Swiss-Prot record:
EC number: 3.1.1.3, 3.1.1.32
Name of the molecule in the record: Endothelial lipase
Organism: Homo sapiens (Human)
Keyword Disulfide bond carried by entry: yes
InterPro entries hit by this protein: AB_hydrolase_fold, Lipase, Lipase_LIPH, Lipase_N, Lipo_Lipase, PLAT/LH2_dom, PLAT/LH2_dom_sf, TAG_lipase
Signal peptide positions (record): 1-20
Amino acid sequence: MSNSVPLLCFWSLCYCFAAGSPVPFGPEGRLEDKLHKPKATQTEVKPSVRFNLRTSKDPEHEGCYLSVGHSQPLEDCSFNMTAKTFFIIHGWTMSGIFENWLHKLVSALHTREKDANVVVVDWLPLAHQLYTDAVNNTRVVGHSIARMLDWLQEKDDFSLGNVHLIGYSLGAHVAGYAGNFVKGTVGRITGLDPAGPMFEGADIHKRLSPDDADFVDVLHTYTRSFGLSIGIQMPVGHIDIYPNGGDFQPGCGLNDVLGSIAYGTITEVVKCEHERAVHLFVDSLVNQDKPSFAFQCTDSNRFKKGICLSCRKNRCNSIGYNAKKMRNKRNSKMYLKTRAGMPFRVYHYQMKIHVFSYKNMGEIEPTFYVTLYGTNADSQTLPLEIVERIEQNATNTFLVYTEEDLGDLLKIQLTWEGASQSWYNLWKEFRSYLSQPRNPGRELNIRRIRVKSGETQRKLTFCTEDPENTSISPGRELWFRKCRDGWRMKNETSPTVELP
């Protein structure tokens, strides 16, 4: 998409009111049939869709243009009928030119798959329009791609099983149409943050769906639970991966948004989050030795609690190009955390802390931090995000992640932050005081911390350094070391992905 991505919502709303719709579409709105039918005038004009076979990593090298019924360009550019064939499909544009991400993706594919055919589907004339008109054109472009694939199938040794359609934003739904219209079944479709407006809640044949290819994997990076979402929120593939919950991406955060508003560059922040899906896919191509893993979970909140770090029964998978086919699943939601830039990989840890108290302190809201010490490196001080509340005399589960590979964990420092002068923390202190007026001294006891690595699936148990001292209070810390019987490997089936 172009730098004018936020105008998408404006143009869409204008279209709805202009068409006489009493209520503009919303995130859960149904799709009107008329918005997906090509206009009558479009049937009289030959669709402007070109297929550019890129034969070099150099973006200045034009390559060859393929057209149905003309075999000479296939020979001139040495089209390999037995190799993998990638079709890259861009999305809506307000600039009318290719974005930089496209050239990076072409280069990354050539680097990873040297013998592959990389075809850029150029539908800029049909995409460089009002968003609603571009949506109407997606079906036309999908038909054009299907015709190209049907023609290629007439050639010896060409197989649809080797075809991988990669669609960004609106291009993801174009890929879905192509997979639906082609004679046969495409091997794979990857949707990179498929567009949301006019597709959220749509019928299965009017958007990208698991039926469009043998394997459909989707990355969601710009979804929102409120208002209009640029990317689609609902799962639309066999596996749907939501990095960082699918909304606020590291490096494109609220502080950047506020700063961009001040300087009038809000579109860059929107573009950053929407386009992050592309860069995650490129990262999976060029940083093959640093794969990122996602974990199946019912929702983002459960993942934030650290509950969903299992690899049993296909519950984890690589993201991007390295994703393993899981044809038996549909609309499987998976989550992970990432860094702010390449390589995006982080290391996930589930921490189980049994908190008990000898005093009836009522409800408390402690602020905990941990520091992990390993054989390779030590982590920074990491916050323990409390999604709901701390349960006393119960086991509480947390998710922490590090940007470095710490190696084997050796010890853990747990810190209970003391009172600060922020209004929020003062309010927390006041509420805690009101909840337990007869027990002004706040103290919790923790004997052990159990840790599970998402990437290796290994488990460790850590005990307090001093068995006689298990108490922690605001402004204090506790140290934990690996218990004598602490190192154990979970006795379960092997992970379904090749873990490093």
